């Protein structure tokens, strides 16, 4: 059995702002000190976007996604995680559907069956873009497939549960974001036949994760969490956390900061110190919406991309940013799924969302972009597969 190393980072930072990274009695305590603050800048989408391509996914019966939860791209292929509403042998079927660059369906990964090379549950998954493999965590094993759907291996991994996000590092190791019921841990784990935990880096009891003035005194420990790898730098956000952390060469430090601040009891504002977006939400009327947390982060040669309920692009060299809006007045339409491929941002918009976008444009007397209008002219409906929008980002400085 192939052995490879897994680094398990399970960190939720303190909400106080007194020290950047400190070690005390075996604890690593993280705060927001020394995070950078940049001035607000006004940019249009056309300032950052070179071109937009629309990719229609095949709508055959075997290609239908039913519902889509996560997407990634590599080698001209789109990998989309679908959890159909159909049930086979009493088990809800979960699949990763693979499409090529033109939107043509290629094959499924994760088909229900009784053979040793098939499985029924996909807890988390990621791409190893160096080895061109799909790695799937099913709750007790990590199962590896080739991009063509060929089974490679299955490794027992029970100590990982629960995993909220996982990714492959440039050196071939893995990193998973995880917590336990009573505490948060950061551990080095060697995935050999004995699956040994070789070292514990940090232990942080939940009692330390309090934010003064927040409802109930503690942030809700829910939400997806996210990890991003760029060259040798790893960015990660614990579930429903307000700080993006950088992990490099064994060191952890705050990188970007999005703060959930209480301005008065039960009235919260979600504010980025980067001034990329601002919005208010009254908990008394609406309740806290987990979708407002950071759901994805990406880093490319030129950009940092933050995804909550909107898409915020930050040009690193110019230190200028832009919000992608989500209404008919927006210059471009974002989607619920997003991934990056070199210097392009790929968003998936489900069929119903695109139909509603068309209706809102009609209400406002606005013409649809020609590429979207062409979809409806060809018979597009709310029962079709999602549509992919590839935004090719400019690389120049401003």
Model-derived features with residue positions:
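Asp-box/WD-like beta-propeller blade repeats and closely related beta-sheet repeat scaffolds
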Residues: 120-122, 137-185, 200-213
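Short beta-strand elements that form the blades of beta-propeller/WD-repeat-like
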Residues: 76-89, 132-138, 172-181, 228-245, ...
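Blade-loop segments of beta-propeller domains
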Residues: 58-63, 67, 95-99, 104-131
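Repeated scaffold domains used in trafficking and secretory/extracellular systems
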Residues: 67-70, 120-125, 160-168, 292-295, ...
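Short coil/turn segments at the loop-to-beta-strand junctions that recur within blades
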Residues: 61, 110-118, 157-163, 204-209, ...
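Conserved blade-ending motifs and adjacent loop-strand segments that build the rim/top face
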Residues: 256-273, 280, 287-288, 318-342, ...
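Beta-strand-rich domains and repeat architectures in extracellular enzymes and scaffolds
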Residues: 53-92
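Blade/loop signatures of beta-propeller domains
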Residues: 21-58
């Amino acid at each position: 059995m192939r052995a490879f190393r897994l680094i398990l980072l399970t960190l939720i930072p303190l909400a106080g702002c007194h020290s950047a990274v400190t070690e005390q009695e075996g604890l690593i305590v993280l705060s927001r000190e020394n995070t950078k603050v940049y001035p607000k800048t006004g940019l249009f989408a056309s300032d950052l976007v070179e071109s937009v391509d629309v990719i229609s996914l095949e709508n055959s019966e075997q290609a239908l996604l039913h519902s889509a939860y996560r997407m990634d791209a590599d080698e001209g292929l789109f990998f989309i995680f679908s959890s159909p509403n159909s049930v086979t042998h009493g088990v809800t079927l979960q699949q990763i559907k693979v499409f090529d660059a033109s939107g043509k369906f290629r094959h499924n990964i994760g088909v229900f069956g009784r053979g040793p090379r098939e499985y029924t549950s996909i807890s988390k998954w990621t791409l190893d873009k160096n080895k061109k493999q799909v790695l799937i965590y099913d709750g007790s094993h990590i199962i590896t497939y080739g991009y063509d759907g060929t089974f490679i291996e299955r490794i027992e991994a029970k100590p990982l549960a629960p995993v909220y996000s996982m990714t492959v590092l440039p050196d071939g190791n893995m990193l998973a974001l995880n917590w336990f019921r009573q505490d948060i841990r950061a551990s080095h784990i060697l995935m050999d036949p004995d699956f040994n935990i070789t070292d514990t880096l940090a232990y942080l009891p939940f009692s330390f994760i309090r934010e003064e003035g927040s409802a109930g005194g503690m942030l809700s420990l829910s939400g997806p969490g996210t990890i991003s790898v760029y060259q040798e730098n790893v960015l990660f956000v614990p579930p429903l956390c307000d700080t993006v952390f950088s992990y490099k060469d064994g060191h952890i430090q705050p990188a970007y900061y999005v703060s959930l601040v209480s301005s008065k009891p039960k009235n919260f504002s979600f504010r980025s110190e980067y001034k990329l977006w601002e919005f208010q939400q009254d908990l008394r009327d609406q309740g806290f919406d987990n979708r407002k947390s950071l759901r994805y982060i990406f880093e490319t040669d030129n950009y940092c991309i933050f995804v909550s309920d909107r898409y915020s692009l930050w040009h690193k060299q110019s230190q200028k940013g832009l919000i992608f809006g989500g209404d008919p007045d927006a210059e471009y339409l974002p989607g619920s799924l997003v991934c990056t491929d070199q210097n392009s941002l790929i968003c998936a918009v489900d069929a119903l969302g695109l139909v509603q976008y068309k209706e809102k444009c009609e209400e406002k007397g606005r013409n649809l972009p020609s590429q979207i209008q062409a979809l409806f002219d060809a018979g597009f409906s709310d029962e079709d597969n999602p549509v992919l929008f590839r935004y090719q980002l400019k690389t120049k400085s401003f």
